[in-house]
A protein has these predicted regions:
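N-terminal secretory signal peptides
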Residues: 1-10, 20-25
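Aromatic-rich carbohydrate-recognition surfaces in CAZymes
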Residues: 106-134, 138-243, 459-473
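Low-complexity, Ser/Thr/Pro/Gly-enriched N-terminal "stalk/linker" regions
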Residues: 36-111, 136, 165
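Signal peptide processing junction and immediate N-terminal pro/mature segment
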Residues: 29-35
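C-terminal capping/lid segments that line or modulate ligand- or cofactor-binding pockets
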Residues: 169-175, 180-182, 346-366, 404-481
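Well-ordered alpha-helical scaffold segments within catalytic/enzyme domains
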Residues: 54-67, 115-128, 189-204, 283-301, ...
Length: 481
């Protein structure tokens, strides 16, 4: 039976008590007795939520190039996991609608749903059904933003009240909102998904007036959270023993000097920020706003909306250069993790992307940039309090599930950003050893014991692992052979 890390038990117990664990939503195969059996871990075909012929062909094509049976088995299990288990298709006003849950929590996160589909975007030109899924999610996300741009997670029914304990949070909980933790990256991920789909297909279908209204509100919200003219409308407090679940000073967060950076209440991990200027998310905002500007220009011919995006991106970029860096202790500069604009900063990294380590994955940094390289090297070291090294693996975790718990996402990120064959091989070895016999990636696992893991069903990590294998097939096929 899966061992639950004690520091994460409180969260999982609360979610289970609220009736939001959705493991019964699909038929999952029983846990593997061991990797040596390599039994198919996918749901039976009749129980799969969504099937794409292009994705199935991609699985067969790439798996045939993988010599290691266990690595091929993991790819075949993980890559289609989002489609197999998390998608619910429908229609709204005659247009496709897609509700995509995270896995074992029955709600749609803007960040997770975007990242979960991202791995399939290169196949959309080949598959009408897959394009319909992307259109459905892009439209669903626009409607979610119009319900409340400050929410991070949403209910399937826009009129339903949250089934999570978030319903008792001290904030403005609206119908349709599952949780209302303000995170910059939530809105940025929707911009990136729209751009990726447009770039791959040149299909204007999802980019209608509804989408444009949602996109405009997203940009306005990012600007509002620069807080130049006061604290803004967002407040959040939660009655919880963990300080990572709430914001200080009446729910507005720690004080800041208003310098043009965007405030974030919470990190991509859903943990509260110590200092409200979360640098990885501000860097992501710059790249995402420029992606959105391109969609406005090309898909809608809306030069004014594109200019609005570009202007905010330029302002935040200027502020990042002035306030987003710190000394590395060795005479150089690195990106800080969080700052307050007064000169105070913390250095750490969290496995959830956008992380400092994961910036190139989002187009928010260049892998060849010396500033980013110094930052990533420092994050993969003892300077980062959430870098863990054990007998099972090395990797980065975060406060969300506690000490000594490595997130496979951080190992995948390291491999995706590396050009060194030995580093990538080591990451693949760690990942193969992390699944605890299940054939899937997890939220986290103990640095000394992969059988001690959190979240048996976490589709974002599964999709990112699929991304890694596809990347290696294109970039370093000899490592798979």
């Amino acid at each position: 039976m899966t061992t639950i890390n004690p520091m994460n038990f409180r969260r999982r117990e609360i979610l289970a008590g609220a009736g939001v664990l959705a493991l019964s939503a699909v038929t999952l195969p029983p846990r593997a007795a061991g990797a040596s059996t390599l039994q198919d871990r996918r749901p039976p075909k009749a129980d799969r939520r969504f099937t794409s012929k292009a994705v199935e062909a991609e699985i067969a094509r790439v798996k045939a190039k993988i010599r290691d049976p266990e690595l091929g088995w993991l790819f075949e299990n993980c890559y289609p996991n989002t489609l197999d288990t998390t998608v619910k298709m429908g229609e709204v006003d005659g247009k496709p609608d897609a509700f995509v849950i995270t896995g074992d929590i029955n709600a749609l996160w803007l960040r997770d749903s975007s990242a979960q589909l991202q791995t399939y975007v290169h196949l959309t030109p080949q598959d009408t059904d897959l394009r319909r899924l992307f259109c459905g999610l892009i439209q669903r996300q626009a409607r979610c933003i119009l319900i409340d741009p400050y929410a991070n997670a949403y209910m399937e029914d826009p009129n339903a009240r949250s089934s999570l304990p978030a319903i008792s949070d001290k904030t403005q909980m609206k119908p349709g909102v599952a949780e209302r933790k303000w995170e910059i990256d939530s809105l940025c991920y929707t911009m990136r998904l729209a751009h990726s789909y447009w770039t791959a297909t040149k299909d204007k279908t999802p980019f209608d007036a509804l989408w444009a209204k949602g996109a405009a509100l997203a940009v306005a919200t990012l600007r509002e959270q620069q807080r130049k003219d006061g604290p803004g409308p967002y407040q959040f407090q939660r009655v919880d023993k963990s300080p990572t679940e709430t914001l200080m000073f009446g729910g507005f967060g720690a004080p800041t000097r208003k310098v043009g950076l965007i405030h974030s209440g919470f990190r991509p991990s859903d943990d509260a920020c110590l200092y409200p200027f979360l640098i990885p998310s501000n860097l992501f905002a710059v790249s995402a706003l420029r992606m959105l500007a391109q969609v406005h220009n090309e898909a809608r011919g809306d030069a004014a909306a594109a200019q609005d995006c570009a202007a905010l991106a330029a302002e935040v970029e200027t502020a990042l250069r002035a306030y987003g860096q710190m000394d590395d202790g060795q005479g150089g500069k690195v990106w800080a993790f969080e700052v307050d604009g007064y000169g105070n900063a913390i250095f750490m990294d969290d496995a959830n992307v956008p992380s400092l380590s994961g910036l190139p994955l989002l187009g928010a940094a260049d892998r060849r940039d010396p500033l980013w390289q110094r930052t990533a090297a420092l994050a993969w070291s003892q300077r980062n309090p959430y870098f863990f090294s054990g007998s099972a693996a090395q990797g980065i975790g975060g406060p969300h599930v506690g000490m000594d718990m490595i997130w496979p996402m951080s190992i995948i990120t390291r491999a995706l950003n590396s050009d060194d064959d030995a580093t990538i091989r080591q990451c693949l070895t760690w990942l193969k050893g992390s699944h605890g016999g299940t054939g899937f990636m997890h939220e986290s696992f103990h640095k000394d014991n992969p059988a001690n893991y959190t979240r048996p069903w976490f589709s974002w990590a599964n999709g990112l692992f699929g991304d890694l294998i596809l990347d290696l097939e294109r970039r370093k096929p000899h490592l798979l052979r």
